[in-house]
């Protein structure tokens, strides 16, 4: 019987445990989670802050007791793995409730410790990050108890944008700052203009090339010299992998602290696997490394690891496409493929179309901007981006499937659209991209 230890019990770890149990009813599975909660919906957290999702039970899928009762998997929360001895095949675990440590042996070790939010040096009682359910509940309680009215959001990634929208939805007066003009970095910068338009339409204050200098109580001094008072600060300034404890082992980390894995999600040590935000792998459609800390990859990794451990060695990870999407007020911004800063590795062309999301004569139409990048020689698709109030998600998902199948830009003329006036055009934007490229 295989004894499996899993480090981390959120998207990657909990899903991996479930998938293993689905295929293997006999092995002992123990999951260690350093925080309070397991199996919660990370992506729901900003909407919980905004009271868009009001019921905590909709965010939390399982408690440890429920997980054990349904799947016979032991989950120990407030238990942090602080050391790995891969030669003896043991982990050292710190019980945060008793402050005692103990060793646990394993046959197979699966690492899904995730990432932690970077922090500013504010040393402030009004400054928070949004990384887990505890963070979110703390922010929610703080806003309610202090009757917070003015909020400062720092950073311009997905979390910051979603929290900004949800704090505004909750009725707070929000100010947004970022240290540069490069926002929402997975999107082409000129296609981010709707973000600014939505901000200005709602009279939300924003400043780029701005940072916090220091915080004194509620008084925030900025690098520009401005001084303002806030009731709440949300820091969304990136993340770093929770891999410090792995340095005690022979598991290889790259220079940024991520774990390189192979097509089976194995580390350099065959009986140690890794998945989720802590890993780096490769793109599916181009020959480049890829670090994609998004939910799909964690779930795919969980399935592949489970298949491998059950003896199905024919299923492998074929790589990321980096498909991503964010809602910001009335707009959807989505992209797939390599990142904008990776285009420099290719000799490419770009084609774009700006057209209504569906037939112009049908009520409720709105503009949709679609852009596709392809290699000049092979004409293979390498990146696509879409922005609009309607239809951006559909087009990007179609192009994701096209990339998955190594389609060329010319193949897009053959895409057969599901056409009716409320949904599309007889000649869809994706078709037009193909025709324009010819």
UniProtKB/Swiss-Prot annotation:
Its EC number is 1.8.1.14. Keywords: FAD, Flavoprotein, NADP, Oxidoreductase, Redox-active center. The active site is at 43 (nucleophile), 43 (redox-active). It catalyses: NADP(+) + 2 CoA = CoA-disulfide + NADPH + H(+). GO terms for molecular function: CoA-disulfide reductase (NADPH) activity; flavin adenine dinucleotide binding; NADP binding; protein disulfide isomerase activity. Gene3D superfamilies: 3.30.390.30, FAD/NAD(P)-binding domain. The keyword Flavoprotein applies. Reduction of disulfides occurs by a thiol-disulfide exchange reaction, but involves only a single catalytic cysteine residue that forms a stable mixed disulfide with CoA during catalysis. Catalyzes specifically the NADPH-dependent reduction of coenzyme A disulfide. Homodimer. Belongs to the class-III pyridine nucleotide-disulfide oxidoreductase family. This is Coenzyme A disulfide reductase. The gene is cdr.
């Amino acid at each position: 019987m295989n004894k499996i230890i899993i480090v981390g019990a959120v998207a990657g770890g909990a899903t991996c445990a479930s998938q293993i149990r689905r295929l293997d009813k006999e092995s002992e599975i123990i999951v260690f989670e350093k925080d309070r909660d397991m199996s919660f919906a990370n992506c729901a957290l900003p909407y919980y802050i905004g009271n868009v999702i009001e019921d905590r039970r909709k965010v939390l899928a399982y408690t440890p007791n429920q997980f054990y009762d349904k799947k016979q998997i032991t989950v120990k929360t407030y238990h942090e793995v602080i050391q790995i001895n891969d030669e003896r095949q043991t982990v050292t675990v710190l019980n945060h409730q008793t402050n005692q440590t103990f060793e646990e042996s394993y046959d197979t070790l699966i690492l899904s410790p995730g990432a932690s939010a970077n922090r500013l040096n504010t040393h402030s009682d009004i400054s928070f990050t949004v990384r887990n359910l505890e963070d979110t509940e703390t922010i929610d309680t703080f806003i309610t108890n202090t009757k917070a009215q003015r909020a400062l959001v720092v950073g311009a990634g997905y979390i910051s944008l979603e929290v900004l929208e949800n704090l505004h939805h909750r009725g707070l007066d929000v100010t947004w700052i970022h240290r540069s003009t490069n926002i929402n970095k997975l999107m082409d910068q000129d296609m981010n203009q709707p973000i600014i338009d939505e901000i200005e339409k709602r009279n939300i204050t924003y400043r780029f090339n701005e940072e916090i200098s220091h915080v004194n109580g509620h008084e925030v001094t900025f690098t520009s010299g401005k001084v303002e008072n806030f009731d709440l600060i949300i820091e969304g300034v990136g993340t770093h992998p929770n891999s410090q404890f792995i340095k005690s082992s022979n598991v290889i980390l790259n220079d940024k602290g991520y774990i390189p894995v192979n097509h089976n999600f194995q580390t350099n040590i065959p009986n140690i696997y890794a998945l989720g935000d802590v890993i780096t792998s490769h793109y599916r459609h181009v020959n480049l490394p890829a670090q994609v800390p998004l939910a799909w990859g964690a779930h795919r990794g969980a399935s592949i690891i489970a298949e491998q451990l059950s003896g199905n060695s024919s299923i492998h990870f074929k790589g990321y496409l980096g498909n991503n999407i964010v809602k910001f007020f009335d707009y959807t911004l989505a992209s797939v493929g390599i990142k904008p800063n990776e285009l420099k590795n290719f000799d490419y062309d770009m084609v774009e179309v700006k057209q209504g999301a569906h037939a112009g004569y049908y009520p409720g139409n709105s503009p949709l901007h679609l852009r596709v990048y392809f290699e000049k020689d092979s004409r293979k698709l390498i990146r696509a981006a879409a922005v609009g109030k309607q239809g951006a998600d559909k087009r990007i998902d179609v192009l994701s499937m096209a990339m998955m199948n190594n389609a060329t830009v010319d193949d897009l003329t053959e895409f057969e659209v599901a056409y009716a006036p409320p949904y599309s055009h007889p000649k869809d934007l994706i078709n037009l991209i193909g025709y324009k490229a010819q």
